[in-house]
Amino acid sequence: EVKYDPCFGHKIDRINHVSNLGCPSLRDPRPNAPSTSA
């Protein structure tokens, strides 16, 4: 399942779906950060 982050519109996996916690940081250190198009 793929969702779109309401703040940036990037595709993110439900595992990394943090949009429900607020806007994820573009400097997110995680390799699967929403700021990256994997």
Curated annotation (Swiss-Prot):
Disulfide bonds join C7-C23. It comes from the Eukaryota. GO terms for cellular component: extracellular region. It is found in: Secreted. Its main location: secreted. Pfam families: ANP. One of its GO terms (molecular function) is potassium channel regulator activity. GO terms for biological process: regulation of blood pressure; vasodilation. InterPro entries: Natr_peptide, Natr_peptide_CS. Residues 19-38 are annotated as: Disordered. Expressed by the venom gland. The keyword Secreted applies. Keywords: Calcium-activated potassium channel impairing toxin, Disulfide bond, Hypotensive agent, Ion channel impairing toxin, Pharmaceutical, Potassium channel impairing toxin, Secreted, Toxin, Vasoactive, Vasodilator. Exhibits vasodilator, natriuretic and diuretic properties in animal models and human tissues. Acts by stimulating cGMP via the natriuretic peptide receptor 1 (NPR1). Is a poor agonist of the atrial natriuretic peptide receptor 2 (NPR2). Is not degraded by neutral endopeptidase (NEP/MME). Binds to atrial natriuretic peptide clearance receptor (NPR-C/NPR3), which may be responsible of the removal of DNP from the circulation. Increases calcium uptake and induces histamine release from rat peritoneal mast cells. Belongs to the natriuretic peptide family. This is Natriuretic peptide DNP. It comes from Dendroaspis angusticeps (Eastern green mamba).
